[in-house]
Amino acid sequence: MNVRAAAANVLYLVVDKGHSLSSALPAAQQTVRPRDHALLQEICYGALRYLPRLEMIANQLMDKPLKGKQRVFHHLILVGIYQLSFMRIPAHAAVGETVEGTKELKGPRLRGLINAVLRNYQRNQEELDQMAVSNNAGKYGHPSWLLKLLQDAYPQQWESIVDANNQKAPMWLRVNHQHHTRDEYLALLKNENIDSTPHTEAMDAIKLAAPCDVMKLPGFDKGWVSVQDAAAQLSINYLKPQDGELILDCCAAPGGKTAHILERTSGSEVVAIDCDDTRLKRVHENLKRLNLQAKVVCGDARNPQEWWQGEQFDRILLDAPCSATGVIRRHPDIKWLRRADDIAALAELQSEIFDAMWTQLKPGGTMVYATCSITPQENVEQVKAFLARTADAQLLDSDPDQPGRQILPGEEDMDGFYYAVLTKTRA
């Protein structure tokens, strides 16, 4: 399939139909040549990063909007504008290939319109680009509700957060400690001429200077290494799992943190629970590649009595469902799929899971509450409320007035993440 047509289809599914990019893009990649996978991904990710700017330009160039069945051609225009504005593809190729996309999208009558719009943009690009950043949505590439939330929560840092959200995320690796030390794996990468640097805090994390195909990584197929952001790897620093313990990874899919616990312990029994059976397949796949064993359970974390009849856990990692506002650079569709009222609904869900999971923790046990969100309502305020209503909960390693640690996007080149460590006091 024509790459530009495939990209337009992805944007249509995400923006108009509410599909996630993580589901729409892999399906579209199956329709294009393998050598075009990276190009398709770049166009889709980039167009979603700068969607308001592209929309403003497209609307300025058209007399009337494309509606109904023609909406996919509106997104084809966005694909063309993105290439001309942000990519190093020669203009004639960007326009020509985008116009060719009308054939496979079954819209040959719109060929002339799309060609005219893109040529018009070429002629007036400087003026149109200036117009497109004249308001905050176009300038910062975020919906107004999210921009206001960030400005209110982080008055000194919101611009750096927004900038980080619009950058390409680096590729972080997690070395499997059961096979190699991090220094040993750094040497293996050096032997393959893959430039990399270790993280200062996440003990198994390595950042690649440039992303690469995982099959080019030494021993990837043997389970020597996994791909995981350094911020997510810090869960092990806070959980501090010990050999021989009974440990629960709650809301575990796709299983990176489950695997990390197993890689760092010996003789532990790890239970991984998630309510999404489809996503749990990823947990099984990851554990199989890494040759690790865990008890994988499909169940609702709010009702542990339905899926767990065993003893209480020594440690629980509660990686709560959240707005994912800390990982926008990896999932730019989040900006357009989330709504302002989602935050309160997610906070309520987190609260219910928090309370239910606390009953499963042994006295003297440790719970790490974690999200990949940066909203106070899901993080600091959530933990404060839990501590206020839970008599046997004690916060560790942080100030009760500002509980936990909030990592912001781009900090040490990491994703945005939140961690709070609590212990259950003994009677």
UniProtKB/Swiss-Prot annotation:
It is an enzyme of class 2 (transferase). Disulfide bonds: none annotated. One of its GO terms (cellular component) is cytosol. The active site is at C372. SUPFAM superfamilies: NusB-like, S-adenosyl-L-methionine-dependent methyltransferases. The keyword Transport does not apply. S-adenosyl-L-methionine binds at C251, A252, A253, P254, G255, G256, K257, D274, D300, D319. One of its GO terms (molecular function) is RNA binding. GO terms for biological process: regulation of DNA-templated transcription; rRNA base methylation. It catalyses: cytidine(967) in 16S rRNA + S-adenosyl-L-methionine = 5-methylcytidine(967) in 16S rRNA + S-adenosyl-L-homocysteine + H(+). It is found in: Cytoplasm. Its EC number is 2.1.1.176. Keywords: Cytoplasm, Methyltransferase, Ribosome biogenesis, RNA-binding, rRNA processing, S-adenosyl-L-methionine, Transferase. Pfam families: Methyltr_RsmB-F, NusB, RsmF-B_ferredox. The keyword RNA-binding applies. InterPro entries: MeTrfase_RsmB-F_NOP2_cat, MeTrfase_RsmB-F_NOP2_dom, NusB-like_sf, NusB_RsmB_TIM44, RCMT, rRNA_ssu_MeTfrase_B, RsmB-like_ferredoxin, RsmB-like_N. Specifically methylates the cytosine at position 967 (m5C967) of 16S rRNA. Belongs to the class I-like SAM-binding methyltransferase superfamily. RsmB/NOP family. This is Ribosomal RNA small subunit methyltransferase B. It comes from Vibrio parahaemolyticus serotype O3:K6 (strain RIMD 2210633). The gene is rsmB.
